[in-house]
């Protein structure tokens, strides 16, 4: 696979950097989003497009943190009493968020003693979730947000939480560990995030059974090709005749690359970077990684091709290719071929799981 280029386009983020309120920040997001989607999409590769979109999100997150703290200072709460880190998970953690992605975030708070720090950061976390919602980032249905105590903790409490999840290999704790594995630092004190990452990977290596537990989670996803090799579309509802790009194509590849990365101690969060590191380590057959990498590039393209609607000046998408798109021969052929590559990767992981299950006492 070709190395991922670093793109630094020259348009101005002045509207974000100079925003003095959530209203101004939302308007800056609308302006830059429209410029990105309408003027630049045709000239940017999928990788360039996602890099630029995620740089936009990161700048908005950092400004939102600044505005929330400014509001707390003005209301008498003061500056943060101890260092903290604002972190993201999900597609933002993997730097694969679309223009319409929702919230997936958390917070790490320093262990430095201060009597009022829990109350302060509970207030800040709640304000952040509310402001991001005002800015067009829907609140996470799974409540993975810094407003929730489960995802807003002191560093030591985070370490205890990670230990707790590692000690219980049931579906929910393993799912939370999988979510946590995509963590990426955005704002605040980076050293807290670095220490969190070290604790996560040290702990993961210390529990060999975790790898199989993650694999069991990884191989579960919706069927996308029938026994004749035809694409399985939605049969009923508003998306009838359409195809679920997120859960039918994108997420299975994300999950596969994540599992292989965790198995081999790779700390990258970007799916493509995980695949590239696996290639460099020669940890997995090259033909399998090549299939996964090519399929993932198509998945990125299809994710940004799903129909969008404009609400309040901001784009929203269901994540489905619609029936009209599915009737386009070239798109349908490309999707079917890519899903064949996904099935190939999936079957390889299923074989690995069967082998692991046979080894269990």
For each feature predicted by the language model, list its residue ranges:
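N-terminal regions immediately upstream of nucleotidyltransferase
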Residues: 1-72
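Hydrophobic packing residues in well-ordered alpha-helices of helical domains and bundles
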Residues: 25, 29, 50, 54, ...
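Core structural elements
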Residues: 26-29, 83, 90-93, 217-229
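Alpha-helix N-cap/helix-initiation motif
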Residues: 46, 50, 114-121, 245
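Active-site nucleotide-donor binding segment shared across nucleotidyl transfer reactions
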Residues: 57, 61-117, 122-124, 129
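Generic, well-ordered alpha-helical scaffold segments in large soluble proteins
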Residues: 60-67, 71, 127, 131-135, ...
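Conserved NTP/Mg2+-binding pocket subregion across the NTase superfamily
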Residues: 123-248, 252
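Conserved nucleotidyltransferase catalytic core and NTase-mimicking acidic/glycine-rich helix/loop elements
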Residues: 202-361
């Amino acid at each position: 696979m070709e190395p991922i280029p670093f793109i630094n386009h020259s348009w101005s983020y002045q509207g974000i950097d100079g925003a003095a309120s959530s209203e101004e920040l939302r308007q800056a997001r609308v302006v830059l989003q429209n410029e990105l989607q309408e003027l630049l999409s045709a000239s940017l590769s999928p990788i360039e497009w996602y890099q630029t979109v995620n740089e936009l999100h990161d700048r908005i997150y950092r400004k939102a943190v600044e505005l929330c703290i400014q509001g707390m200072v003005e209301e008498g709460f003061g500056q943060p009493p101890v260092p903290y880190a604002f972190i993201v998970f999900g597609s933002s953690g993997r730097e694969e968020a679309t223009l319409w992605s929702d919230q997936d975030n958390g917070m790490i708070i320093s262990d430095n003693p201060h009597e009022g720090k829990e109350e302060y950061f509970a207030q800040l976390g709640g304000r952040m979730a509310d402001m991001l919602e005002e800015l067009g980032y829907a609140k996470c249905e799974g409540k993975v947000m810094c407003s929730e105590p489960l995802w807003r903790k002191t560093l030591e409490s985070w370490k205890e939480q990670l230990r707790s999840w590692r000690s219980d290999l049931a579906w929910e704790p393993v799912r939370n560990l999988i979510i946590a594995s995509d963590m990426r630092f955005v704002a605040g004190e980076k050293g807290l995030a670095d220490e969190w990452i070290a604790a996560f990977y040290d702990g993961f290596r210390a529990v060999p059974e975790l790898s199989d537990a993650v694999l069991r989670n990884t191989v579960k996803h919706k069927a996308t090709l029938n026994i004749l090799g035809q694409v399985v579309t939605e049969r009923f509802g508003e998306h009838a005749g359409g195809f679920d790009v997120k859960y039918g194509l994108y997420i299975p590849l994300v999950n596969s690359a994540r599992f292989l990365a965790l198995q081999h101690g790779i700390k990258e969060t970007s799916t493509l970077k995980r695949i590239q590191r696996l290639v460099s380590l020669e940890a997995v057959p090259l033909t399998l990684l090549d299939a996964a990498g090519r399929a993932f590039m198509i998945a990125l393209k299809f994710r940004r091709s799903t129909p969008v609607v404009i609400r309040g000046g901001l784009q929203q998408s269901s994540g489905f290719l619609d029936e009209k798109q599915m009737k386009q021969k070239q798109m349908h052929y490309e999707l079917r071929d890519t899903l064949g590559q996904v099935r190939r990767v999936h079957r390889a992981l299923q074989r690995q799981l069967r082998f692991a299950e046979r080894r269990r006492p």
